[in-house]
């Protein structure tokens, strides 16, 4: 994927260009139509996502937790902690997502630990409010 697309995601905005090139090798683009379930509560954690365009809703046990849009990310907690998904995330408009598969996380941690540390910091900030 084009590394410049990652610059629009706050998580990656401060990553130096040389490391951003590496992040881009770990990432892929994915699209989803309105109404598509992107991750399902209780499911296995196979990837985490950052929203490039569009909006999603986050629900747990059928209760609405949050609406997310461009620049936001989700699914990282279950991937980093190797746990089940804690929430269902559904597209509420057509969305364009940056996807990083779970098997890329160890490689990413070796190549750029500061990015993974930032993810972990964000998890602590959210204190489990969504996944």
Describe these PLM feature segments:
Residues 2, 19-22, 84-86, 102-131:
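A small-molecule sensor/coupling module
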Residues 3-61, 68-70:
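Regulatory nucleotide-sensing modules
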Residues 51, 61, 82-83, 90-92:
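A short, compositionally biased micro-patch
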Residues 94-104:
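A short hydrophobic beta-strand segment most commonly corresponding to one strand
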